[in-house]
Each structure stands twice: as C-alpha cells, then as structure tokens.
C-alpha cells in the first residue's frame, strides 16, 4: 500500500465526529504558544516589508477545517495591527489590508471551512483557499509575510518505501505506525521525514518574503523517548490491536492490516532541530519545548477516542472500506475502559514552538 497523507484530510463535515468538533487538544497547544509568537512578531518582524503594496499576507499551511485556523489568523492580525500602531506616528498610518491563504490538501473540506469562517465585519481579512500539498510550493515566490503551520509536519508525504513490503527488513509487521520498536522501520520513517522536512522548508523559503516569519507548532518526542512509551503511542498500538481482533472476527482481513501503515512520524526533538538547522534559508528566532497544557488533566476515554477518530477516519475508511470505523472506535473505547491509560507512568510527548526568519 502506497499511502499518501495528501489523500487523507481530517474528518469533514459538521457532525459529532468531525475534526471541527474534535480539535480542542490541538487548540490548547496552539493557544499556549500565542504569547511567544506574539513576542517574536513584535521583536523580529519588519513591517516595512508590506509597505510597498499595503497588503499584509498570511498563510496557514495544513489549515484543515475551523475553528483553530481562524483563531490563528486573527491572532496574527491582531498582533501585526498592535505592532503597527505602536510603531507609527499619528499621521503616518497608511491603510493596511490583510489577506489570509488557507492551505490544505485538495480533498480537505474547504466548503465547511469557508461556511464556518467569521463573517464581515468581524472578519478583518480577505480569504483565499489554496488546495495542494505543502510538501512543495503552493504560493508565488516572495508573497507571504507570515506563515504558520500547527500539528501538521508529523504527517509525512507518504508511507516510507518497504514498510508494507513483507519481503523487506523494514516491514512494519503487527503495527500500524512507527512506534520505534522496530529499528529498520524507524530508520525508514526517519529517512522519509528528513526528505519531507527539507522539501517543506525549501518551499516555505521561496514563498516567504526576505525577513518574513514562519511559525511551526506541533508535538515531538523528547530525546531518548520512544513513541510506544507515550500514551499517544499506546492508543495507536491499541487501535492496531482492535484491527487484529476485527480480522479474527472476519470484519476485515489480516492481509489488509499487513498492508497498512500510517504516514505519521513523531521525531525526537534533536532530529527536528537538526533538520531545521541544516536548512540554510532561515535564522532560528525561537525554538522551545514545553509540556502540553492538558498534561496532568484527566483525559476521558470519550475524549481520546473522539480525538483519534477525527484524524484517522478518512485514511481507515479508504483502506479498510465502509462500515469499519464505527466498530473500530467502539472497540477502542471498550479496550481503554478495560485497560485504562496510566498517564503518570507513561512518558510524555512535548509541544514545540518554533519561529524562523527568512534570510
């Protein structure tokens, strides 16, 4: 199976299982970084970059469907307006317009995205939908002043070669993800991550104006920690166990499971840092990790099941067919109830906040 993340957006629509209603975990991390990114914009961005044309352009890469992307856009706009007001004299304020590019895969539910965006005059910007993989350029050269992406770059452009090949040393047998248990599998995923991150950074370097900022927020593993040791890794492995149980019940087949692996890789922080430093197009203005804001708070089984369902439904339906998702996540909820996650014992992923400046 050659699985490309380009084909599998978050759950669409507006029902109880859609991403629009199950993205509060991501929102908490994004919100926790607002003050840091605001400070970087104030200290590192030269507003003269937009003075020639009177339009300030922002892009959210991998926007999915609201509301997180709209909060991001408005937060950046509010910060730029405050900085501009602070730096301008009474008679020097020239009207500045804002344009926001919402980018995601062509299969993203752009209809729901734009139906749920704030209406004018509350919305202070002109909206543009940009379908296309961010693993490559999606916008003209030197066109963006601030780029943003959050909870996206753990999605690879495709499943690494040989991971679903039974004859390969990198065959991900018995697992549906790179949980760092199998060395050859981890190597294959890391190679793909390195390729994709290079392409991502090179594309953003072309799209950003010199002096423009790129904000990157997401989760990674602390150095020395493997994904299977975290609660997120445990949930993903449990989903794999549920699929195997369903194969034994005849609902799906072991053959389909053997040919299934997610195009997802959570790097260790040093891996992520190394790839960014290796790219010569940016200076690093901020690179920090913190614990997730919800760490230490009780996450219910319903919350966990709904969160994972929102980002896995499309890819699971595509590979295993209709009628599998409801049963799969019913079984997941049951397993989590019978075998509760020991959050205290599990190692933690960390949230990273990175701000890069285009040279």
Curated annotation (Swiss-Prot):
For biological process, the GO terms are: methylation
Q: How the cofactor binds, per note? A: Binds 1 Mg(2+) ion per subunit.
Pfam families found in the cross-reference section: Methyltransf_7 (PF03492)
Enzyme group, top EC level? transferase
| Cofactor(s) required, per the database record | Mg(2+)
GO MF terms, alphabetically ordered = metal ion binding; methyltransferase activity
Keywords from the UniProt entry: Magnesium, Metal-binding, Methyltransferase, S-adenosyl-L-methionine, Transferase
Which residue pairs form cystines in this protein? none
Q: What is its EC number?
A: 2.1.1.-
UniProt KW Methyltransferase keyword: yes
Q: Where does Mg(2+) bind?
A: 172, 258, 260
Q: Which domain of life is it from?
A: Eukaryota
Q: Where does the signal sequence lie?
A: none
Q: Which residues bind S-adenosyl-L-homocysteine?
A: 19, 63, 68, 104, 133-134
Name the protein family.
Belongs to the methyltransferase superfamily. Type-7 methyltransferase family.
This protein's assembly is summarised as: Homodimer.
Please give the name of this protein: Probable S-adenosylmethionine-dependent methyltransferase At5g38100
Protein's organism: Arabidopsis thaliana (Mouse-ear cress)
């Amino acid at each position: 199976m050659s699985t490309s993340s380009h084909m599998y957006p978050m759950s669409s629509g507006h029902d109880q299982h859609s991403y629009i209603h199950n993205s509060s975990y991501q929102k908490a991390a994004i919100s926790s970084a607002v003050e840091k990114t605001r400070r970087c914009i104030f200290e590192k961005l030269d507003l003269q970059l937009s003075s020639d044309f009177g339009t300030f352009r922002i892009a959210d890469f991998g926007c999915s469907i609201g509301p997180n992307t709209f909060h991001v856009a408005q937060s950046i706009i509010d910060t730029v307006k405050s900085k501009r007001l602070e730096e301008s004299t009474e008679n020097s304020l020239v009207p500045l317009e804002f344009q926001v590019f919402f980018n995601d895969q062509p299969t993203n539910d752009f209809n729901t995205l734009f139906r749920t965006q704030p209406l004018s005059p509350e919305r202070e910007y002109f909206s543009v939908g940009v379908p296309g993989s961010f693993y490559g350029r999606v916008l003209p050269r030197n066109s963006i002043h601030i780029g943003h992406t959050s909870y996206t770059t753990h999605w690879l452009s495709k499943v690494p070669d040989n991971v679903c090949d039974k004859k390969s040393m990198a065959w991900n047998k018995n697992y549906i993800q790179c949980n760092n248990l199998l060395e050859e599998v981890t190597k294959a995923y890391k190679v793909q991550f390195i390729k994709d991150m290079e392409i991502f950074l090179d594309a953003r370097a072309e799209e950003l104006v010199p002096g423009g900022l790129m904000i990157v927020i997401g989760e990674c593993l602390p150095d020395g920690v493997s994904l299977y040791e975290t609660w997120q890794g445990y949930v993903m492995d449990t989903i794999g166990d549920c699929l195997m149980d369903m194969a034994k019940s005849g609902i799906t087949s072991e053959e389909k499971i053997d040919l299934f692996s997610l195009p997802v890789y959570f790097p260790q922080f040093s891996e992520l840092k190394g790839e960014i430093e290796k790219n010569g197009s940016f200076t690093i203005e901020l690179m920090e990790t913190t614990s997730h804001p919800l760490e230490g708070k009780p996450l219910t089984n319903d919350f966990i099941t709904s969160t994972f369902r929102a980002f896995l439904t499309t890819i699971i339906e595509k590979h295993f067919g209709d009628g599998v998702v409801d049963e799969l996540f019913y079984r997941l909820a049951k397993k989590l109830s019978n075998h509760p996650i020991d959050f205290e014992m599990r190692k933690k992923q960390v949230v990273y906040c990175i701000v890069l400046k285009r040279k």
